[in-house]
Every structure is written in C-alpha cells, then in structure tokens.
Amino acid sequence: MQFGFNLPISGALAAPDIVARIAGEGEALGYDYLTVTDHLVLPDAAEPGYPYSETGAFFSADAFYRHEQLTIAAWLAAVTSRLRLVLAVMVVPHRPAVLAAKMLATIDVLSGGRLTVGIGAGWLKAEFDAVVTTPFAERGAVTDDYIAAFRALWGTDKPVIDTRYVRYDRLVLEPKPVQNPLPIWVGGESGPSLRRAARFGDAWYPIGSNNQHLLDTLPRYKAGLARLRQLTAAAGRTPDAVAPTYRVKRYGAALSPQPSDGERRLFSGNDTDIVGDIHALEDLGVTAIDFDFERPTEAAVIAEMRSFRERVLAKV
C-alpha cells in the first residue's frame, strides 16, 4: 500500500517557498507520493452543485490564486527527489492533445520517471467555456480520444491517428517518457468514468465523497469495484487489470460517520477506525490511498502530516 498527500497549490499556502517546504516534509516523512489538482481559471461566482462537498460549495475567495498544474509538477520534479508526482486529476480537454502529451513526457523525463497521470473529463462548464474549443457536452468523448492519442505518441514511433478530435500523421514526439507505459489513473465515479478506467486505466482513482455517485462506505466501494471489474472484462482485459485506489478529502472528526445507506462512512471515527478502513481497502486490492491535510497554515499542515504518520500510518 502506498500513501500520498494533497499538496496545496492554491490560496494562502501556494507561495513557492511554502509549497517546497510542505513537499520536502512529505518526502522526509516517507510518504510515497504527492498530488496536485487542476483548474486553469475559475468563474467569479461558483456554479452550484460541486459534487465533492455536502453543501455543493466549491472554492473560497483565495482559491483564485492557483498555480497551473503541469507547470507546478515540472517545478516539483526539481525540488523533490523521491516522491511520485500524481496529477489529481488533469482535466484532459483543457489542453490540446499533442501539447499535453509533450508536456507530460517532459515532466516524466525531468522527474526521472516519477509522474503519474491522473485524468478526468472535468465538470465546471464556465471553465470549459473559457479555455476549451470543443463543446462541454462532448468532454467525455474528447477525453477518450486524447488519452488514445497520448498512448500512441508515448509508445509508438511516428504514429498515425485519425479520430473525431485528434488527427496527426507520423508525428515524432521525443523524448519519450521514462516510464513505459506512463501510468494513467482514471478519476471519477460515474458510469462513463468507470468505463474509461476499464478501457484505458492502469488504476481507478475515485473520491469517495461524490454526492452523485457515493463510494463512502465499504459496501458502496465494493459495488463500484465489482462494476469496474465487470467493465474491464467486457473491454477485453483481465478483470483485475485496473488497480483500485482511493482519495480521502476529509477524515476523522471532520467527517460525519452516518451516510445514507446506514453503514459507517469510510475514514470517519477515531484513529483505530481509520487504520481498520485502510486494512479493509487493502483486503480489496487497493494499492494507494491519499489524504488531504488541508489546514489554514503551513505549520498546521506539517504538524498534521507528522501526527497522522505516527498515529495512523505507522500502525498499518
């Protein structure tokens, strides 16, 4: 089992020196990977219905200060030496396919093969309207075409591709990524996301707290995983070809223990409960879990990273 942490790249903690210190602390503490999120621009007024919070609230005023995901990942390749760099997740339609493939390959080379490409189709229409030339309603199909283009450019010399959204003929992309294949973790919890993971993913990378597709209890996660394995087999792959992972936005006392299905919510309760949840997910084959140590100050983030490592992860 690998354990990661979300690195703040927006708001008050996004100053470069703070980001570097938090990343360095995570590396020194023995975490396996860090994650960075992706938004290019944000609307002045948030659209309602953010799926990963109970209230639908998405961002605060200081979230407008936000580093571009791939740029910060390249910078982190230079300020870390061991941590894997996980994109959590890259909104695939936001960047042209060939440009994104080149940038991702470059980051993998600069990091010595430490990049993991978490991907998603996106959800914020106002952001799409500002930066994407393809229609918001077609984002799933665009994402699938772009992923296929990434794979071809990374793994084939002079590939040819002719799809609805990507066309090129015998392009040469060098250098190739260090990793072959460059791992793709498919985010999302919906039916289309599961089908995408089944077709393209090296791992499935869901957040448990999506209010529209909850995976916040052990039975719910088991059902999602069973569905993924059915879809993976239907896609012509071995059922367990896609490694399951899990993203934790809140935990412990910050999380209500009783969801709508009457079961105990994963990662609610005390430290012993959280250790038990990690073991339960490990028994299902989960290979990686990351936690969001969101706190108002750098000192508080680092203190929780240290404390959580001692209280919980050291007992797994």
Task: Name these PLM-found stretches.
Residues M1-V316:
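Active-site-adjacent structural elements that line small-molecule/cofactor binding pockets in enzymes
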